[in-house]
Design a protein with these regions (language model features):
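Conserved N-terminal entry element of GNAT/NAT acetyltransferase domains
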Residues: 1-28, 138-139, 150-173
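Conserved donor-binding loop and adjoining core beta-sheet/short helix segment
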Residues: 6-15, 22-110, 224-234, 240-243
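A structural microfeature
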Residues: 74, 141-143, 221-222, 295
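Acyl-donor-binding surface of acyltransferase catalytic domains
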Residues: 78-163, 298-302
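Conserved acetyl-CoA-binding loop-helix of GNAT-fold acetyltransferases
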Residues: 93-108, 242-244, 248-265, 270, ...
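Conserved hydrophobic beta-strand within the GNAT/NAT acetyltransferase core sheet
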Residues: 117-120, 237, 271-275
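Conserved active-site tyrosine of GNAT-family acetyltransferases
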Residues: 128-132, 286, 291
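Flexible, substrate/cofactor-facing loop regions flanked by secondary structure
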Residues: 152-235
Length: 303
């Protein structure tokens, strides 16, 4: 098979990569480490940075591998300065070799020592992990835990809130301001409302699943965005957080229960979430709310 690689050309390449991720999921759900939701978020935020701030450097951090008919077979992406995602079909896993070569060459262009490049894998892709070992990479001790919850065959969950607290979706600029205040308090992430409007154009964005939980005084107490692919009947929570002063009151559990109930009404069969291995409270929350650990997403660097 004749295969060639090329750089990013236009916005349609992002749609094609998103389609590749979804196609591979239907073949082998756990082969690639990048979920459709996290890719949608990443791509829309980059388009937002481009439109709002004129930032285009991210375009040079994408490489695509295609057959002679320009069907996409694989892609390599620097998600940020040093974190790399590689996407392939299982039948085209051999492309991971030239992809890795490109990653290291691009890292040199970015003035990154090989030891600084961090490559993410799914532990359900042993070929990729063995390849990295053979090339002198070693696994970091920390990892993400990927969890899933089955939404079929069950009744709606109880949404238990303290008196006066309410859950709603973001429906106004005031709601969005409260949400962004929450993400800054929890994750130290000061979001931009103009970029967020572009983020909302993602194919997996559903307005009714962009949730905030408010105190009786109207303060942001907890929040959670859920991304839904109707064709896959799969959703993902990202992000989820509770403002420090409102923790230990069951608000995270209530918001997740409400989100799962809304997903059931949309016909969603499964929802996922990820948490860092050392995030004790987050892992307890997801375990308590019915998310079962499925796999680890590992990170590799050169020795």
């Amino acid at each position: 098979m004749e295969i060639q690689s090329r750089g990013y050309q236009d916005q349609s390449d992002l749609s094609t990569i998103g389609s590749l991720i979804r196609q591979v999921y239907q073949i082998d759900a756990y082969w690639n480490s990048w979920s459709f939701a996290l890719f949608d978020i990443w791509s829309q935020r980059n388009l937002g940075d481009q439109e709002v701030f004129g930032m285009t450097e991210w375009q040079h951090n994408i490489r695509l591998w295609e057959d002679r008919n320009r069907n996409l077979l694989g892609a390599a992406v620097f998600r940020d300065r040093d974190l790399v995602k590689l996407i392939t079909f299982p039948d085209h896993k051999y492309l991971l070799v030239p992809m890795l070569d490109w990653v290291e060459a691009r890292g040199h262009q970015k003035a990154l020592p090989n030891q600084k490049i961090k490559i993410e894998t799914s532990e359900h892709n042993p070929f990729f992990e063995k390849l990295l070992l053979s090339q002198g990479y070693e696994k970091d001790p920390g990892h993400y835990i990927y969890r899933e919850k089955d939404l079929t065959g069950g009744q709606n969950e109880l949404v238990i809130l303290p008196t006066g607290f309410t859950i709603q979706h973001i429906d106004s600029s005031d709601d969005l301001e409260k949400f962004h205040h929450g993400t800054k308090l929890v994750f130290n992430f000061p979001d931009n409302p103009d970029i967020y409007q572009i983020l909302r154009l993602a194919p997996s964005f559903v307005p009714e699943l962009d949730l905030i939980l408010l105190s009786p005084e109207g303060q942001i107490a907890s929040f959670g965005s859920i991304w839904f692919d109707q064709r896959l009947s799969l959703a993902e929570f990202e992000p989820v957080g509770t403002v420090p002063e409102f923790r230990k009151r069951g608000l995270g559990s209530a918001l997740i229960a409400e989100g799962c109930n809304r997903l059931r009404r949309l016909g969603c069969r499964k929802v996922s979430v990820m948490s860092w291995s050392e995030s004790v409270e987050a892992n307890r929350l997801y375990q308590r709310t019915g998310f079962l650990p499925i796999l680890k997403k590992n990170y590799w660097r050169r020795r």
